Regions:
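Short acidic, Gly/Ser-rich segments with clustered Asp/Glu that frequently serve as metal-coordination loops
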Residues: 2-8
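Active-site-adjacent betaalpha module
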Residues: 28-31, 35-36, 61, 65-229
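A general structural signal for short secondary-structure boundary/capping elements
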Residues: 42-45, 210
Length: 229
């Protein structure tokens, strides 16, 4: 849930599905996970120059300015992976250098709004601190080996709860790969949002429930934790 995908500085609707999902996470899911000792892994785009150089054409097109209008995208926002995003409104009355699109350490790749504070609090926990994992595709579990897969194996984690944006792209891609690799998958439906039409969200929730694992919601997860503790 990075600035590029949620910040009004990139034309995002501050009342959209992604922001509603963020509210559910902050209010219900994250506190419940911490109470239950569930490890929170913040999986985010964080590209290196080498990764941009080796990126397949299909991925370059997804975030590129060339042909953006044909897919309903703003060419001034979708400047190409690694492309400079320029000065942006920081949401605090000032401006900030947006940095290279989805590059590691860039402002546009940082967590949006209150989530940054939530992450900083979580990574300082003495037990099961939050973890930040970089990815370089929509799915964080694509191919033979990724940073996320290595972490999950090292920690012996086999059951995964999925949240974030966009449900039908990054979240869904990772969930499907996780399912194929033998993980138990639970989609927290209202903890995930997408800028795609509503049917895209419905499709992901339908298949997550019928084929890829389970679907729950953030409030239900929190209530379940409360009953267990």
């Amino acid at each position: 849930m990075q600035n590029f995908f949620l910040s009004p500085a990139f034309g995002r609707n501050s009342q959209g599905p992604g922001h509603k999902a963020m509210g559910q996470l902050i209010q219900h899911a994250i506190p419940a996970a911490r109470k239950a000792g569930v490890r929170i892994v913040w999986v985010n785009w964080g590209l290196t120059e080498d990764q941009v150089e080796s990126m397949p054409t299909s991925m370059l097109r997804t975030f590129g300015a060339v042909g953006a209008e044909d897919t309903g995208k703003d060419g001034s926002v979708y400047v190409g992976l690694g492309g400079e995003t320029g000065m942006r409104d920081d949401g605090k009355g000032g401006e900030v250098e947006g940095g290279g699109l989805l590059m590691r350490g860039a402002w546009n790749s940082g967590l949006y709004g209150e989530l940054e504070k939530v992450y900083e609090e979580g990574r300082k926990l003495e037990s099961n601190p939050d973890v930040w994992v970089h990815k370089n595709r929509m799915s964080a579990l694509w191919g033979g080996r990724t940073e996320l897969e290595e972490f999950l194996e090292e920690e012996g984690i086999r059951s995964l709860l999925f949240t974030g944006v966009n449900t039908d792209q990054c979240v869904g891609g990772t969930l499907q790969d996780a399912f194929s690799k033998g993980y138990d998958c639970i989609l927290l439906g209202n903890g995930a949002g997408t800028s795609s039409p509503a049917f895209a969200q419905n499709c992901m929730e339908y298949n997550a429930q019928k084929s890829w694992g389970f679907v729950a919601d953030c409030e239900g997860f929190a209530k379940g934790v409360e009953q267990m503790t």
